[in-house]
Amino acid sequence: MELSVLLLLALLTGLLLLMARGHPKAYGHLPPGPRPLPILGNFLQMDRKGLLKSFLRLQEKYGDVFTVYLGPRRTVMLCGIDAIREALVDNAEAFSGRGKIAVVEPVFQGYGVVFANGERWKTLRRFSLATMRDFGMGKRSVEERIQEEAQCLVEELRKTEGVLQDPTFFFHSMTANIICSIVFGKRFGYKDPEFLRLMNLFYVSFALISSFSSQMFELFHSFLKYFPGTHRQVYNNLQEIKAFIARMVEKHRETLDPSAPRDFIDAYLIRMDKEKAEPSSEFHHRNLIDTALSLFFAGTETTSTTLRYGFLLMLKYPHIAERIYKEIDQVIGPHRLPSLDDRAKMPYTDAVIHEIQRFGDLLPIGVPHMVTKDICFRGYIIPKGTEVFPILHSALNDPHYFEKPDVFNPDHFLDANGALKKNEAFIPFSIGKRICLGEGIARMELFLFFTTILQNFSVASPMAPEDIDLTPQEIGVGKLPPVYQISFLSRGGC
């Protein structure tokens, strides 16, 4: 008994000493931040409304670069376009590491192009960019794929005959099929039961990853991982998707012709076979599955969620939708397919799409980076291995760059002559070496899908515009729009 009392006293004394010391001195002069508690970190400074609210409040007190302890994890937050650009572009190599998202870490464990680090990441990113270019990303062929998929959606929407719909499934299916065509070499019918199951898994998983419980898991995952929670459902969902991808890989193996690769998986299998004698090769089964999952997840969720926000905003602001209808009618007309060449002639529609991305703010706290070496940044020392969050919300809502950031206003992207203007704080895909792999294809999809739908349909809601609520369903790693109902009413179209 005496020994246990002594041990307890020693533990309490140690905790008190840590509390008295505040920030660990061994790491030099870290950016400022609230004093952490042992184990709990800055839990007491966290807002009940989630991590984003917490970080924005701390920014007001500590400035654009500050230190936060997410439980025992030391992290640095970057706020505003200047700090984010200085880190991710001006010091690109030092900030090019990938941090962890606790709720998906057990699934990826540092594999796959998104969550890899070091030479693994560089190798997989080079291969992924080159291969996706070879199979159409950024070329006319992918434009044709998007146009064809948009027409498939138009046919599905015509079948609804103006009946109120939740558009989530339609937008998920449409965007997923573009990635499927590049990665798997095929598209799926909208009623395919396996495809329907996948779409549901993606939707549910993204909502869970962005939930408040997952944000709490981010702080205390080393403890909470032993208990039931949303993290286990996320794990099970993503494992089921990985099992589907593995089945697709096996089908590709059985029918592979090395002289005529059909898609991303074929190209990877050919490279894998070439390097099979190299024990250190990164081209192995695990990296293939996790890279395909990363491309599939990111390529589906980002664009489809942006479109969900976009059409909700069209219901909220019908006068903006009317201007888009007019521009579509003037530039494209009713009888031909919208093309990427039309974008330069449609500055208002392009500005609306930019503003949807800005206002939608899909990844408000960004995907965490990690510094690859000790670095002096703005007079502070950030030690190697420190996770860094580029708070994209702080750039997309900076009043120095967007006059009224809380208001949806396409004029944020129009000059005095009505032409599209660039804004350096517009970074929905992040910036630097870790910029979203699919930025190019996402921009194409948003323009072609958005204009094709509004060329063929006007949109309506049973609710008055002033009664439509834009309050997000979740704000965490991702920001999800509320669930809503919409009618697609035929305008004649193609």
From Swiss-Prot:
Catalytic activities: an organic molecule + reduced [NADPH--hemoprotein reductase] + O2 = an alcohol + oxidized [NADPH--hemoprotein reductase] + H2O + H(+)
Pfam families named in the record: p450 (PF00067)
Membrane topology note: Peripheral membrane protein
Positions of modified residues (Phosphoserine): 128
InterPro entries: Cyt_P450, Cyt_P450_CS, Cyt_P450_E_grp-I, Cyt_P450_E_grp-I_CYP2B-like, Cyt_P450_sf, Cytochrome_P450_fam2
Enzyme class: oxidoreductase
GO terms of biological process kind: epoxygenase P450 pathway; xenobiotic metabolic process
Gene3D superfamilies: Cytochrome P450 (1.10.630.10)
CC annotations in GO: cytoplasm; endoplasmic reticulum membrane; intracellular membrane-bounded organelle
Main localization, broad class: endoplasmic reticulum
Cofactor(s) required, per the database record: heme
UniProt key word Phosphoprotein: yes
Induction (record text): By phenobarbital.
Entry keyword set: Endoplasmic reticulum, Heme, Iron, Membrane, Metal-binding, Microsome, Monooxygenase, Oxidoreductase, Phosphoprotein
Location in or out of the cell: Endoplasmic reticulum membrane; Microsome membrane
Positions bound to heme: 436
Any GO MF annotation of the entry: arachidonate epoxygenase activity
Enzyme Commission designation: 1.14.14.1
Function statement: Cytochromes P450 are a group of heme-thiolate monooxygenases. In liver microsomes, this enzyme is involved in an NADPH-dependent electron transport pathway. This isozyme seems responsible for metabolism of 2,2',4,4',5,5'-hexachlorobiphenyl.
Family per record: Belongs to the cytochrome P450 family.
Name of the molecule in the record: Cytochrome P450 2B11
Species of origin: Canis lupus familiaris (Dog)
Designated gene of the protein: CYP2B11
